[in-house]
């Protein structure tokens, strides 16, 4: 039961109690009276001697409070005093009646409020029941959609946890940045603007000196080969791919020539990235088939050995035609003096920091390697060097700074075994190993711009890095 209803019940019980007292007790005020008050489980003898006394500690079987007024002992001589006490008691009863009336009014007001609230609660309960029914309908209709949304949101929980962690770190970083800014501000004040300008000038001076130093770098000696880096896997077991060592920094075209014979299609790619992705930019149909895989692109033109001959062809990519052709005198061809793997690799054309070269063998030199420097325009032999290294015993070869480096095999375990310097016309045996990852090298050429070896290894286009020992010229050396 609510609090206002309890309050109303208490008031009604109190009014009944007072009414019972006035009807039963007040008529006996004229005489003596001795009353026993019933309290739960006890009986108490009361002998009034000092005037009227009011007790309200007893309860009837219905739980109502029973107030009992005990009159003092009767004394005819003290009637005036008793009358005075009666008046006082009546005043108290009147005051109590007034209080009860006020309490009754409040209780009625509270009771009306309770009734109003009860009506409102019933309406609210019905409203909630309606909302609950609507909610169930809504949940039945959209439960799967909400579940999918929740499933989508579940992965965000660890993200939010991480975000909170990151937020703490960001706060720390902000604090550190503030501290660092303060330190930098102090440093800047100590150094001053003029010191920054001086430091900038020193950096520019160092850059100039570095460029001058790079210009004084002479051709280096091969010390080490590392790699390989596999750029792409394509084509047959044998072929060639190359870039132009004299091209500008913005020109990174790649040329691709698959197979060592019976082909005359050259594919061009604008960059290494396009080559890897297969985004071919142009195709050239050469007027002649090539022999071998030892071609070279130099200053915008392709140099290759014409099939079944010792003729060298110069083909311009820009003009799309042959610019020059010349027979390499006494040079063996068509697998007379190839490298160890064969493939019509009799004539090897290559380029380095010095210029254009041809490596081949002749009967006059007993099948040993001959090195010839060529004029890039006319293909005329400018100068030749005869070595004592058998061409058929060489796996591959390449030129770096006028020195020919020869590998002892095209198979696993190959190394740079022999070198010949055209500057000093001397040779030496070397021991520079490299990793033949795919077991069969059919093309190995040096690119001076990239400072790298381009190789075709069993259908894989790979790159090797080279380490050169450089000598820096000083003003005293010039």
Curated annotation (Swiss-Prot):
Instruction: Name the keywords, alphabetized.
Output: Coiled coil, Disulfide bond, Glycoprotein, Secreted, Signal, Synapse
Residue span of the signal peptide, if any? Answer: 1-23
Summary of the tissues where the protein is detected: Expressed in the brain (at protein level).
Which ranges of the sequence are coiled-coil? 77-217
Primary subcellular site in the record, as a coarse category = secreted
Task: Name where it's found.
Answer: Secreted; Synapse
- Which residues are noted as glycosylation sites? 33, 95, 179, 299, 465
Task: Tell me which GO cellular component terms the UniProt record holds.
Answer: AMPA glutamate receptor complex; extracellular space; Golgi apparatus; synapse
Question: Does the entry feature the keyword Glycoprotein, yes or no?
Answer: yes
Q: Does the keyword ATP-binding apply?
A: no
Residues forming the Olfactomedin-like domain are: 218-470
Stored PROSITE patterns: OLF (PS51132)
- What InterPro entries does the record tag this protein with? Noelin_dom, Olfac-like_dom, Olfactomedin-like_domain, Quino_amine_DH_bsu
Please give a single GO biological process term from the UniProt record. Answer: eye photoreceptor cell development
Listed as disulfide-bonded, the cysteine pairs are 219-401
Q: Name one Pfam family in it.
A: Noelin-1
Subunit and interaction comment: Peripherally associated with AMPAR complex. AMPAR complex consists of an inner core made of 4 pore-forming GluA/GRIA proteins (GRIA1, GRIA2, GRIA3 and GRIA4) and 4 major auxiliary subunits arranged in a twofold symmetry. One of the two pairs of distinct binding sites is occupied either by CNIH2, CNIH3 or CACNG2, CACNG3. The other harbors CACNG2, CACNG3, CACNG4, CACNG8 or GSG1L. This inner core of AMPAR complex is complemented by outer core constituents binding directly to the GluA/GRIA proteins at sites distinct from the interaction sites of the inner core constituents.
Under which name does UniProt file this protein? Noelin-3
Task: Identify the species of origin.
Answer: Mus musculus
Gene for this protein? Olfm3
């Amino acid at each position: 039961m609510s609090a206002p209803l309890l309050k109303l019940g208490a008031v009604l019980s109190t009014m009944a109690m007072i009414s019972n007292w006035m009807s039963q007790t007040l008529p006996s005020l004229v005489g003596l009276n001795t009353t026993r008050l019933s309290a739960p489980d006890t009986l108490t003898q009361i002998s009034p001697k000092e005037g009227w006394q009011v007790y309200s500690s007893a309860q009837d079987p219905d739980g109502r409070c029973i107030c009992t007024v005990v009159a003092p002992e009767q004394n005819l001589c003290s009637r005036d005093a008793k009358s005075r006490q009666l008046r006082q008691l009546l005043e108290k009863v009147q005051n109590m009646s007034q209080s009860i009336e006020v309490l009754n009014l409040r209780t009625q007001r509270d009771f009306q409020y309770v009734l109003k609230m009860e009506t409102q609660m019933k309406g609210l309960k019905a409203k909630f029941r309606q909302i609950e029914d609507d909610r169930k309908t809504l949940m039945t209709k959209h439960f799967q959609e909400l579940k999918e949304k929740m499933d989508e949101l579940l992965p965000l929980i660890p993200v939010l946890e991480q975000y909170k962690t990151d937020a703490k770190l960001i706060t720390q970083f902000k604090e550190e940045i503030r501290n660092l800014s303060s330190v930098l501000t102090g440093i800047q004040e100590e150094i001053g603007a003029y010191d920054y300008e001086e430091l900038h000038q020193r950096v520019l001076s160092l850059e100039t000196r570095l460029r001058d130093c790079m210009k004084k770098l002479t051709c280096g000696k091969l010390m080490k080969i590392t790699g390989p880096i596999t750029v792409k896997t394509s084509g047959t077991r044998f072929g060639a791919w190359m870039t132009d060592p004299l091209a500008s920094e913005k020109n990174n075209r790649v040329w691709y020539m698959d197979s060592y014979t019976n082909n005359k299609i050259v594919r061009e790619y604008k960059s290494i990235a396009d080559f890897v992705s297969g985004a071919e930019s142009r195709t050239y149909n050469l007027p002649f088939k090539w022999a071998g895989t030892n071609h070279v692109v130099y200053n915008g033109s392709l140099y290759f050995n014409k099939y079944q001959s010792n003729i060298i062809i110069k083909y311009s990519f820009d003009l799309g035609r042959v610019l020059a052709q010349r027979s390499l005198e006494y040079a063996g061809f068509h697998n007379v003096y190839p490298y160890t793997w064969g493939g019509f690799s009799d004539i090897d054309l290559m380029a380095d920091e010095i210029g254009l070269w041809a490596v081949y063998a002749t009967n006059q030199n007993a099948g040993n390697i001959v090195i010839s420097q060529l004029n890039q325009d006319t293909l005329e032999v400018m100068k030749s060097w005869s070595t004592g290294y058998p061409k058929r015993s060489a796996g591959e070869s390449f030129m770096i700074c006028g020195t020919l480096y020869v590998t002892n095999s095209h198979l696993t375990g190959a190394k740079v075994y022999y070198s010949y310097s055209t500057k000093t016309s001397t040779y030496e045996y070397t021991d520079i190993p490299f990793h033949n990852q795919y077991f069969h090298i059919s093309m190995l050429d040096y690119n001076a711009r990239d400072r790298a070896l381009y190789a075709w290894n069993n259908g894989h286009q790979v790159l090797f890095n080279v380490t050169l020992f450089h000598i820096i010229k000083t003003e005293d050396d010039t």
